[in-house]
Amino acid sequence: TCSVKLYPARVMKRLLPPTIQAIATHPMFGPDSGKDGLEGLPFVMDNVSAHEETWRWWVDEFTSWKMDVLMMSCDQHDREAAWSQGITHFIGRTLAELNLGSTRLATKGYQTLMGVVEQTCNDPLQLFYDLQRYNPYTKQMRMGLRGALVTTMEALKEQEEIL
């Protein structure tokens, strides 16, 4: 999957012959987000083993598509993606388990949450599994989320005890 960088970059370095040039890329959008055009959408790149000339050519090519080309290491990508894409997919899949539906009382916030459910569950389930399994930082994200839920639940419990 494009959504994880460290694992596939390590595999490419280990398995590909040195004559093969490799660049790790991640368009930070899918079909839903890019359906109206690519302009301004983030596109991450890291040079795994490409020659400088090849690397520059691809950077220029993707830049010419008017995407926001972000050059960052695979490690930095996975760190940031765990807390952006990873948590979004985790929350979306978790909310989907609640089988929430439409309601006439839906606030804008609720509609936004339902949009997250729709967007993340529209992606293949394997993408979710890969994000959670192969990104070395998503476990830390999930543990942080669990801790935040516990803290919030405890704060509510304290407020209930005041009554």
What feature does the model see in each segment?
Residues 3-68:
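Rossmann-fold dinucleotide-binding core
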Residues 2-3, 107:
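Short linear Ser/Thr-Pro motifs
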Residues 68-163:
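An accessory alpha-helical subdomain
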